[in-house]
C-alpha cells in the first residue's frame, strides 16, 4: 500500500476537532402532557394526559391527595421539604398512573421526619417567596434552587422545632401575611431580601 496505488492514498486529513454542540437531556425525551399526583403520604405518580384536577383518584387506605397538577414529561419538578431543602425530579422518570405510584423518598433523600411543603414545576425565569415558621423569609430565583443530586439543595436554614412553611410563586408587587394573632400585614415585595 502507498499513496501511488489505487485506493492507497489517505482519505482523511488531520485537523483540529470542531466544537461539539451540547444537547440538553430534555431533547431526548418526548414531550407529552402528564398529570402529576402526589399523596399526603408521599406516593407520587404521573398519569398520562391532562386529567381534570377534580377527578376522583384512588389512593392507599388512609391516604388522600396533596398535590395534583398538570405538567409535561420534559418538565423538572421541584420538591420543597420542611427541612428547607429543595429536591429536583424529572417528570419523565416518575412511575405511570397504574397503581398507587412509588414513595417519593425512594427517589430523593428526604428524611422520614421531614414533610413535603410544596411540589411544583420548575420555571427558570420564576421566583419563589420562601419562609419559615419563625417568620424568616426571602425571595429566591427558581434557577438557584435546582439540585443536581438526590440530597437536594439547602436554601432555607431551619433548626429545632422551626420548619419551612412555604415556597409561593412571586406574583404582583405586594405580600400579605396573616399572623397567628389573626392580624394582616401587607408590605411591598421589594422590602424582602433576594438571594
Give residue spans per PLM region.
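Short, structured "edge-of-domain" segments at secondary-structure transitions
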Residues: 1-195
Amino acid at each position: 500500500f502507498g499513496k501511488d496505488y489505487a485506493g492507497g492514498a489517505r482519505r482523511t486529513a488531520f485537523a483540529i476537532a470542531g466544537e461539539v454542540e451540547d444537547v440538553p437531556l430534555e431533547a431526548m425525551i418526548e414531550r407529552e402532557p402528564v398529570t402529576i399526583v402526589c399523596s399526603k403520604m408521599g406516593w407520587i405518580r404521573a398519569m398520562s394526559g391532562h386529567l381534570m384536577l377534580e377527578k376522583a383518584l384512588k389512593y392507599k387506605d388512609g391516604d388522600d391527595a396533596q398535590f395534583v397538577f398538570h405538567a409535561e414529561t420534559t418538565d423538572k419538578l421541584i420538591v420543597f421539604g420542611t427541612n428547607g431543602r429543595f429536591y429536583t425530579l424529572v417528570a419523565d422518570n416518575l412511575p405511570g398512573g397504574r397503581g398507587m405510584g412509588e414513595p417519593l423518598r425512594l427517589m430523593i433523600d428526604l428524611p422520614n421526619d421531614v414533610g413535603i411543603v410544596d411540589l411544583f414545576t420548575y420555571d427558570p425565569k420564576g421566583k419563589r417567596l420562601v419562609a419559615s415558621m419563625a417568620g424568616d423569609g426571602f425571595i429566591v430565583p427558581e434557577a438557584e434552587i435546582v439540585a443536581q443530586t438526590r440530597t437536594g439543595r439547602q436554601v432555607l436554614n431551619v433548626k429545632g422545632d422551626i420548619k419551612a412553611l412555604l415556597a409561593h410563586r412571586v406574583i404582583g408587587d405586594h405580600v400579605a401575611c396573616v399572623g397567628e394573632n389573626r392580624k394582616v400585614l401587607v408590605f411591598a415585595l421589594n422590602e424582602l431580601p433576594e438571594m
